[in-house]
From Swiss-Prot:
Keywords: Cell membrane, Membrane, Transmembrane, Transmembrane helix, Transport
Main location as per UniProt: membrane
One of the record's GO cellular component terms: plasma membrane
Gene: ENT7
The name this protein goes by in its record: Equilibrative nucleotide transporter 7
Amino acid sequence: MTNPEDIPSRIEGKNVARLVCCFLGVGSLVAWNAMLTITDYYYQLFPKYHPSRVLTIVYQLVANVFIITLATKEAKLNTRLRNIFGYSLYTAGTFCLIILDLASHGSGSVVAYVLLCLIVALFGLADAFVQGAMVGDLSFMSPDFIQAFMAGLGIAGALTSVLRLITKAIFDNSPDGLRKGALLFIGIATLIELACVFLYTLVFAKLPIVKYYRAKAGKEGAKTVSADLAAAGLQEQAEQVHQMDESKIQKLTKKQLLRENIDLGINLSLIYVVTLSIFPGFLYENTGEHRLGDWYAPVLVAMYNGWDAISRFIPSIKPLAMESRKWITVCVVARLLLVPAFYFTAKYADQGWMLFLTSFLGLSNGYLTVCIFSTAPKGYNGPEANALGNLMCVFLLGGIFAGVCLGWLWLIGNDSF
């Protein structure tokens, strides 16, 4: 076992680590958000196939199957390889989107749609690898890191929305403008994913404060950090962690962790059941025609993403962070009222009220998500925090998948179905 004096004492680089965590958060969602944000292009190509709903189900089905599998084996997995593989898969997937569009000349054929679904399935696989690995890894570090990573998830949505509005404005009146904007958009996402591969592989593990937390977690019995310790030049500590006798490691089982945190897990699922039952399918297909015309849906998506991103920074201000589990539960349950609110707003109100509701949907989604992920790992050692982070991701993706499936209910009685 690693001696206390072997643990790096230098913990400089906290701000750099937060910045890298934020960028890695952007990279873990920018590929999928790019798909969601250019959905208007895919509706032009495949108007009869409900692309926003179908692609989301494909993505979430694959992500859920693999995140459950990976979460059950998290203690024995190489976190470093898991993250590198996930970000590399994101990079390959976004590049394949460009190749597919160029090869099919932007046609809306069934073959192109099937291939598009397969690429989206790759994104789901990448999500399962990256989300659990990154959240689990950051859960035994400073709470600021998990907040920065979660903020990055929100920034990914806001960034893609802003870029989408810019490209739509630039190419709106040009021939084949929607397609040109979408290709430029996916190209930018590919570069971001590639940057994440290099950042995680070459930079993150070597930051002094990251070395400190990983060496500390290794001392507590977290074997998942072994490869990252070796990559950071801490060969001796990595070898000691690798050879550690698991029977001597004191930690709670996954069932015990689940019992102690089932309230947070259910709350996290409910947050995303509500969000994904509305966003993005309802916003694209059930909000009617308004003065903004074909700008209406992209603007709604941008409002959601913008407020979701802003709200994820609020818990970093300590007095504004919600740590009470009871109050988190109250807020999550109250948020269920957004479903009938959106229904009646779409049916009877004007676009101003819809913009307000969409903004609140994003604001509450981001804020409550960060509060839960920041609260859950407190008081646990390295292996327990890593396991709990993976379990929370299972609840998150489960809620997203349930929300996506429930989103189809909006089509009942809809003449366009």
